[in-house]
């Protein structure tokens, strides 16, 4: 297929231009087949480091590696056609220096073909974000609750519920926006703060447990489909697929053990002998 005939993907500048416009729809995906489904309805597919929790059963996102993100990012790119694909930079791949961040981000962009990367952190990461943007790397920011910082935060509690924390997170968002981020994820903050951030920054905000006033929303796909045994308060279950999948597996196991499967329609017959 020629480049001219290929489906055109959304770009970071197009997402940036959606500020105060039609809400931006984002979901996570880690596989080609779910990416193909999500791609039909979403503006952005996030290959989140939450794959550590969802796919690998880690308690936090800290153990996730750059190689894991690249592998799943490539899968999502193969499964999608139109959405902007954003790949999370995992813990330890960008914090040491601006140069480390660029080296890691360049690997992700080159090896997956994705359109942007995401980094967690506010004022402390602003210089790094500007460094990346100035070198051709589109960056999505992430402020509020930053899961990669769980060992210093101590818990996954909502942020910005007192005046001091709220003021700090607002300044984080401003710094990330001014550094050149094309959008900012705002996670698990008090609703008035989510509104205030959205009004204060030039970049579109994408809320996850923030505010309906944000410029867009994101959820973890498995959470909203009912595939996770537990989900945060900010998740709305749009499906309850877990019990249905379990029932299908149970039925399969029962039919195998009773020799009801495979049936005659599931096996191959010999070719008929040629007529003499």
From Swiss-Prot:
GO terms for molecular function: 3-methyl-2-oxobutanoate hydroxymethyltransferase activity; magnesium ion binding. The keyword Kinase does not apply. This is 3-methyl-2-oxobutanoate hydroxymethyltransferase. Its cofactor is Mg(2+). Its EC number is 2.1.2.11. Pfam families: Pantoate_transf. It catalyses: 3-methyl-2-oxobutanoate + (6R)-5,10-methylene-5,6,7,8-tetrahydrofolate + H2O = 2-dehydropantoate + (6S)-5,6,7,8-tetrahydrofolate. It is found in: Cytoplasm.
